[in-house]
């Protein structure tokens, strides 16, 4: 029988014709909103839980905990529901009510704290007590491998390898790390461009991380250049 998990990935790649005024450049966007949970985060959430179960790191009675600013929480709640696991999600208090309700609808417990950094600290503390298992998207190689195994190959195949630049926001950095690794193996000349908010901008889902909170999966040598993006530019 088909599962919701079968709908994760293989999202469309479409050309942005209206936004691009340079006839010598083709800009393509991957519509990750078509994933069942509504974002690219379905890929790592499902892969992290599935891989942990296969390794025996977690059991069917394991309680999961994760810090998230939004989309990962929805994806984690969905994936945990699919695998019949309990999950608690720590989120910033300024998260939209709709996101919280969506996570709760999938069966997750949601704890609201003052910032994403506080959420990460809380998840670390709860996992250290032994009551929970933290997948830790910020340090989990299965976050990266999800994009190495699915996102990047899909883009490569859909473009038939005709890609010169890959541009990605940097939140957990799982997407840009996994795609960079794959694309550089295929063609080292492909430029990997990361986007982060300017110091005075707040863009939901991505951060300009303080050094002490940089994701452990982030390898700076895998990014050729970083662009600072204002909130107005992001919109």
Regions found by a protein language model. Name each.
Residues 1-235:
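PLP-dependent amino-acid enzyme catalytic core
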């Amino acid at each position: 029988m088909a599962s919701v998990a079968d709908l994760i990935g293989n999202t469309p790649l479409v050309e942005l014709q209206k936004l691009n005024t340079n006839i010598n450049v083709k800009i393509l966007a991957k519509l990750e909103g078509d994933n069942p949970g509504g974002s690219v985060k379905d890929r790592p959430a499902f892969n992290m839980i599935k891989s942990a179960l296969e390794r025996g790191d977690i059991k069917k009675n394991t309680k999961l905990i994760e810090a998230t600013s939004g989309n990962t929480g929805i994806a984690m709640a969905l994936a945990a529901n699919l695998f019949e696991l309990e999950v608690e999600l720590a989120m910033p208090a300024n998260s939209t009510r709709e996101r919280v309700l969506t996570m709760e609808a999938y069966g997750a417990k949601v704890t609201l704290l003052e910032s994403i950094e506080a959420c990460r600290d809380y998840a670390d503390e709860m996992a250290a007590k032994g009551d929970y298992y933290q997948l830790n998207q910020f340090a989990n190689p299965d976050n990266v491998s999800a994009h190495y195994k699915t996102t990047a190959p899909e883009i490569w195949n859909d473009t038939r390898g005709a890609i010169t630049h890959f541009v990605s926001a940097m939140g957990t950095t799982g997407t840009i790390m996994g795609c960079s690794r794959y694309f550089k193996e295929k063609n080292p000349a492909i430029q990997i461009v990361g986007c982060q908010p300017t110091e005075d901008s707040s863009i939901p889902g991505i951060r300009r991380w303080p050094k002490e909170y940089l994701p452990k999966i982030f390898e700076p040598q895998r990014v050729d250049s970083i662009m600072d993006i204002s909130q107005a530019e992001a919109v």
